[in-house]
Amino acid sequence: DHGFIGEEDDPDPSTASLRWMVDPLDGTSNYVHGYPAYCVSVALAYRDEVLAGAIYDPVADECFTATRGGGARLENRVLCTTNPLQLSDALVAVSFPPHVDRESLAVTDFLSIIPHVHSVRRTGSTAINLAYLAAGRLDGFWVRRIACWDVAAGLLIAAEAGAAIVPCRHLSDPGDASLPRHVSLDRPAFVAAANKKIANGLHDLLAG
């Protein structure tokens, strides 16, 4: 018995141990405007532990995949994150909702981060951000509020490529930067980066 949870679905009341987390179009606004940053994201979880994930970018015709403990791949190429030595060298990305006001935490976070990194990108697709982190195209990423179907596949792909993940609920104590074994269904928040040094640097700026 399999359950499903996704942006286009009503909440699934089933108690199935295996669940598919599906976002059929991550980056909807981009798609509507013809901006080429959108994708399909699919993950399979046993209870709350993600076992496999795939992100397909139809514009670039790229498919990023991962299985827990089996590594991450772009087509047949094994993925590995970059290794920037300093936070100031890092190209990072952020996801936050549209129509934010200047007093919002999203703006505060952005202003806290941007002086300390090489540059910040906002692609409009969380799944693509995580796939690009896994592929070495980005060095870091953060998000405060997001749905599980937006990140379930991407978190696994990034972690299997070597990324360090710090949940935002641990902002007062970064601890060990590793992939949380459980994907929260109540809007997960986290910092992800190419290595622990960059992850903890971003984390500390957000905590400040």
Each PLM stretch: what is its role?
Residues 1-47, 54:
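Flexible, acidic active-site loops/lids enriched in D/E/S/T/G that coordinate Mg2+ and/or position polar
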Residues 135-140, 162-164:
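Alpha-to-beta junction loops
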Residues 3, 52, 91, 139-140:
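Short, Asp-centered acidic motifs that coordinate Mg2+ and/or phosphate
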Residues 17-19, 51, 118, 139:
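Conserved acidic residues
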Residues 8, 96, 144-146, 168-171:
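Short secondary-structure boundary segments
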